[in-house]
Amino acid sequence: MEEHHRRLHVKAERASVIGGDIVDGAFGSWALRAARSEHQLKQQSNEDLAQNARISALLGEMRPRMSAMPPNGHQQQYQPQLRRKANTTNIVDVSSQVPSARNAIYGSWQDRHRPTRLYGSQLVSSSSTLPKYDQLYCNTASPLTGNGSTNTIATTGIRREPPEYGNVGRSVSTWQVTNSEHRPSLQAGWLKSSRPLARGALSPAAYFRDLENRHGSGASSPIVGGLSVVAVPITQRHAPTAGLAPISDDISTSKVSLDTENQQLNNEDSDKISGSALSRNTPRQASFMAAMQRHPLKESSTSIESNGGGTNTEEDQTVSATSKEDPSEDTGHDDPEETQEISETPIRRSRNRNASLRNRQSSRSLGGLDFEKLRMGTARVGDSNEATAENGTSSSSSRKNSRDDGLTSSPTTVAGPVFTTSSTSSISTSGEASSTAVAAAAAGSVAATTSRQTSSNSSVDSNHNEAMKMIRRARPKSYVLATSASMNEDVLSSSIIANEQSSSISHDTTTSGRELPSSLMGSTISMEMRSGGASSATTTTTSNSGQQTSRSLNAPHPPATHRLQRFIALFNSSKTSDGSGEHKKSRMKRSRTSLPASRFALPGTILQRDGVARQTWVKHQEIALGKSGKRNNWEDRWAVLCRRSLYLCVESPAYTTEKTIELGSHTRVDVCNAIVDIAYDWLSSSFSKQRHVVRIVTQNRSEHLIELNTESEMLSWISVLQSSSEDGIATGSSVDENELSTTGRHNNNAVSNSSALLHNSQSIASLASSSCSTATTSEFLNSQHTLQQQQQQQTNQKHQQTVNELSAGIVSHLPTSKSFGGLSTTASSTTENAKNRLIMHRYIAKNSQLQSPTANKKMETDPSTVPSSSQTMATTSSSFHHHSSQAGPSRDIENGEAPTATATTPKSGRKWKKSKAAKQGSGGGSSGSSSGSQQQGAAGAPQPVLGVRIADCPTGSCEDHVPMIVQACVCVIETYGMDTVGIYRIPGNTAAVNALKESLSNRGFDSVDLSKVESLDPRWRDVNVVSSLLKMFLRKLPEPLLTDKLYPFFIDANRISTHHNRLHKLRNLLRKLPRPHYDTLRFLIVHLSEITKHSDVNKMECRNLALMFGPSIVRPSDDNMATMVTHMSDQCKIIETLIHYNLWMFDESSTTEDAVPEQHPADGQNPLEPGGYGVGVPTGVSAASFNDMHNLIRKANEDQAAAMMNEGKGQKIKNMLRRNSRRDKSKSKLKIESTAPAAVNPRGWTQPTPSNTSAASVESAFCGNYQERDIDAEIESRQTVSPQMTSGSADGASSTRLDQSPSLESSLGSLPDTSRTEPILGSSGYDDDEAKEAARRKRQEEMYSARRIFIAGAAGAAAAATTTADAEKAAIDALANHSQHLHLASSPAFEVLSEETREKIRRMQKKQSWHDTKELRSGELLKTYSPTKDLTDALSCTSDYSTTSSAPLSTNPPLAVACADQPNSSSDYASSDPSPCARNPSTSPASRPSNLAISPAQLHATSSSGQSHQPMSRSQKIRLRTKLGSRDPARRHTLSDVDTLKEGRLDKLARWFGIRKSSPDVSRDEVSDDEKNHQEAPPLPAAAPPVIVRTSPNELTPVSGDELL
């Protein structure tokens, strides 16, 4: 014994032990390498040196954080229930009689207080220095046929310096099994340890160094013997009753003879102690096992002892020879007296023998690997079978109860490497089976390890089950990640096991907790273990040749929570589950931290191009099966569908050829027998949020979501995936085709057809629920409809009934696996359950929760395009009916039938809210959309019609660029609306327009058959509704027809003065438009030109149409008020030009040399081209030009208008108007008389009269412009040429026409300033009372004639023409001729005042009385005429095209009407346009005269009896008092009503209303008492009217905006 320890000390010094982290079983290889002599190391090949370096790096990267532990003598005793089993270093002592052996160290060590790590010489500088590394020792005593036991002890491996931690993370090594040699691969990951390492009494390294120190110092203390190096992970449960320590050593194969002392100790303690080798449960064991196989020993019988002496070497060789000669000696020891047991630690001894210990370690152990046998391949299947037969019943019984979780001695054939557990460490080198191991890894190698136990099977089972319940707990996530790692490509090409033969592992179902999926076990053929019998079926597995990989390499592995499942997944080599044998269900424990299997990337692969069905970029996510709710963790993947596999790659293929495609790192989804359908829960009611998601549920119970870009792409992927899935069903059915009868094959095909029908019906139902109405969807529905009819004929009635029940949602009636031709495999049953339970139950239930409150409303669809419910049920076996009742509007409800199944809306459905996009409507959020357009069904997917670019709008054909909506609207209008008065001018009903818009959005243009308008929606026959829809479409375009880029060029081109240059420029710009814009514009302009050809009927001339379409077609995208104000005239003028010259503008064959068409008469007059404005219009007035007018307006008011619009908020403009009104009122203290010279001018003064030509030119220039409010009146006014306008008339009449022109005060610079003050010379004629009376009478006649014409219309003008006096007739005719175009009353449609109002006015006139007036004072009197500059400001200077000017400019326009004798100079309250154009007072109540006090019947009475009245003084001024007549309080005030209030006795009430006094501000002079008495007398019935003096027009500005009423 002393000699043994002396040699041990020498070996330790020679090895120069340097600190390093050696864990688990990997140190065995290092120990033997370190113990070799120097000359052996020098003779080692370069390959071995490279392997040493690789293993050294591996061990360094996998270093745990170990450190020294408390010094010797301070052993910490833990209770069994308080110890943590995992991550422990196993040291057991065989000599239980020795106290030091009983207190052997158990556990691995981690010092949490060590600040740094020591390396190199720091660890060996002193003999008392504790090593900073971990070593694994196992004290064992192995009997050798009664000759005693050998004890092998060795030092650990040497690594001079550790690798740097900062370069790479602590890697995880994974194994991949193919036909080449094992090679562990390093993956940067697993950056922290799985869990803290357990603390024990003393470090095994410290314990061993203490032994060395005591031996070297001559200590006489007892030495613990029986130490042997365990080079591999130790099996946790061995058969202690077998008497053999089943510890395999794949490297250290030689034995060192030991004294019989240890043998005796072991014999004495054999009945008391049942030992069990323990292992650390770290995820690195596979890495060290890989390292061990890469570094096998070349010498089987010479090991460490060759350096120390030859005695033990000879003994070892003798042992090996003995083992070869008698293989049955070590396999059949049943005598307990001859058995040797492994000593257990004091901690473990507190357990119930070794049963509880072994059960506590259940399903976590790793058997010893005899990799030398695997490498050499010396054993054969036949040898294993023969050895198994020799073992007998007792051996089989012990094998069954060994329970090594697939790593035991069961002589079964499974797909995986064989982990042999041998009783000795010797290995035969002659190629025969070892005497101690009857199993060897060869072609289809069979493992048989002889280990026995004497305890009863029942007690073992019960103890094991109890222990399994105690040890089940959740694994940390880091541990799951480490043990679930997949494999790399380099291992695929380099690994080999058992001479290119695959082997498997037997798995006992009684020792694990949960069922292991058959996809993990592959073609594992589990053996039926029978207690009491040694018979077991052994079957050789199919060998893999070439580079063929196993199923476990291509398919993702479910996460294993312990090493047994991981090794099963790593080493099974069968790919297909052919169902040739009965599978034995395996149970596995699931971890709560497990991840989806396909999350782990597989190495690259090469695919055949002919097998690739489809590939593109998709968004993918995998969710846990059965999880509810949406997740947005989408990942971009390159999807490649090849046969029955879907490859999801991170990057697109880097290298492709004509025949192959090389994929990089990817995940693989098996779509064989998968369920493919639309993900209904991702459907959205908003088009902008619509997602096209495909759901794939595979047979291994994983769920994948794939998002495509478009609907057509989604449908094509569904079709291809379903065909691939059905091909998988057909392939699975053909496996047992020889065993199936003709009837069975018929049933299988029928059910396959039914399954295909089920897929197709689900797709149709999803399409119907999504309300997709595009052409692609219609074609798909038709094709699927035809396909289902064909499949319906092929399916028999029995299976048809089954499919009907399934599609109707009856989950209780489910077919068995016999429906698929009698296949009873697990995959088939899983597929059947997934198809029936998952998609029919879960998805339909989820779809019912997605319904919106409007989902059950009637769906307005064309019955001719959608099949009825009865037809749908007949063709799709009621699946479409069921889905339509669940996911979308029910067709049965629409047809008046009661649905068979209704979906109840859960509470979540009550909280359903309309999205923002749905509230705004599909037309881009128009403000006029009704509530019907705001609500969209949750299952609907409306296609927007409005708010879409021209290029994206649906068209009739590929060559046609005109949108379908434009063609439809134009077709309807040209068919039914050419003779409609006011077409495009009169708007349609807003609700009807929105209804048409929604109909087109939901159903598209397929339901609009213009050839059968009678059968369409009645709203399509309303031309006003259709015209409004067309204008709305143009207004909602994101980019107008004349694009933003060319818009400023069009504006500049329109302002070119020369006619031919302007047309050429406009045509050149038109040809620069995009093709869709150009074609659509040409289509519209040609249509508008056709409208103008019927203008005599529809009253829509070119300029009227330009007013309607100019702001919609010619506009910028960012409509701002300043641009609209300044460019309004240009916009309308451009459209007018295009309509006039459409043939020349859109002639694509024309060139620049073509002659320009002559200028159209209505095209206007350019400033540089005087004359030619219109037929019969004289020339000479340059200010009448439209462009000149616009330029003047733009230059004067553009900046001011923009500034005012910016200040439009907060009533700033209103305050400005009030301030201006107060400022102007202070200037109105002077008496301002009327500007009507014929009425107020004295005889001594005559106003300068312009020429008739000038007057006519101005009148024709301004009075004949566009009038949006009254189309017919404007046409009549332009067509009527009065002879009094062109022929010379009286000077007074000419002055009246000129001065009272409504556009006079609004024309910039067209007339001189008429604000003047001239003295009125007194003459002796005024002293004559008769002259006074004549002047007064003449004025009254002119005034009353105008009122009579206004009230009575044409009849009043005819009556006025019959006046007896020639002068009166001439004056009345002049006044009537001037105002005739403003007071047309030929049509009742343009009569503003009703008969009731006229009657009220007549009654008021009859009640009115005139008072006597005093004579006018003689002398000079200053008469001030109304200044034109007060009215000619920015508010009234707007182009005659401006129909919708800015709000600030039109809020409070100044009033030009102030008195009764100026009826025609008023602006229009009812119009928001302060343009200089003439207004038709009959269309607006704002231009009512301020005094309607005299009826036409009083005219003759006044003129005939005028001489009898008392003469009135010239300066006499009185106030007119009228009584307030009864009015309808609900009617809005007109000027007549307002003036009545002002002139009555309710002055305070009028002021309370905020209405300034607009009646004649007549101040009384001092009146004598006689006159006062005379005034108080009863009024005369024919009293003369007073002299009215006009007030300042600026004083009449309303105080607030409410007075616009």
UniProtKB/Swiss-Prot annotation:
SMART domains: PH, RhoGAP
Pfam families (alphabetical): PH, RhoGAP
Region (Required for localization to adherens junctions): 1-574
GO cellular component: adherens junction; cell junction; cytoplasm; plasma membrane
Superkingdom to which the source organism belongs: Eukaryota
Keyword Chaperone applies: no
Location of this chain's protein in the cell: Cytoplasm; Cell junction; Cell junction, Adherens junction
Residue ranges constituting the PH domain according to the UniProt record: 599-726
One GO-annotated biological process of the protein: Ras protein signal transduction
Chain ranges of the Rho-GAP domain: 948-1146
Annotated Low complexity bias: 353-365, 420-430, 530-552, 868-879, 928-941, 1301-1312, 1461-1476
Any GO MF annotation of the entry: GTPase activator activity
Keywords for this protein: Cell junction, Cytoplasm, GTPase activation
Site note Arginine finger, residues: R985
Bias (Polar residues): 728-745, 846-855, 1244-1257, 1278-1300, 1438-1453, 1480-1493, 1500-1515
Free-text disruption phenotype from the record: RNAi-mediated knockdown of isoform a results in mis-localization of par-6 in embryos.
Region annotation Disordered: where it falls in the sequence: 293-430, 529-556, 574-593, 728-752, 846-942, 1152-1176, 1207-1258, 1277-1339, 1438-1533, 1554-1605
Ranges of Basic residues composition bias in the record: 908-917, 1211-1229
Gene3D superfamilies per the UniProt record, alphabetical: Pleckstrin-homology domain (PH domain)/Phosphotyrosine-binding domain (PTB) (2.30.29.30), Rho GTPase activation protein (1.10.555.10)
Compositional bias of kind Basic and acidic residues: 323-334, 1558-1575
Subunit structure: Associated with the catenin-cadherin complex consisting of hmr-1, hmp-1 and hmp-2; this is mediated by interaction with picc-1.
Function statement: GTPase-activating protein for members of the Rho subfamily including Rac1, RhoA and cdc42 and other Ras-related subfamilies including let-60. Mediates radial (inner-outer) polarity and gastrulation by excluding par-6 from contacted cell surfaces; acts by inactivating cdc42 at inner cell surfaces which limits active cdc42 to outer cell surfaces devoid of cell-cell contacts, where cdc42 can bind and recruit par-6. Required for blastomere polarization.
Name of the featured protein: GTPase-activating protein pac-1
Taxon lineage: Eukaryota, Metazoa, Ecdysozoa, Nematoda, Chromadorea
Gene: pac-1
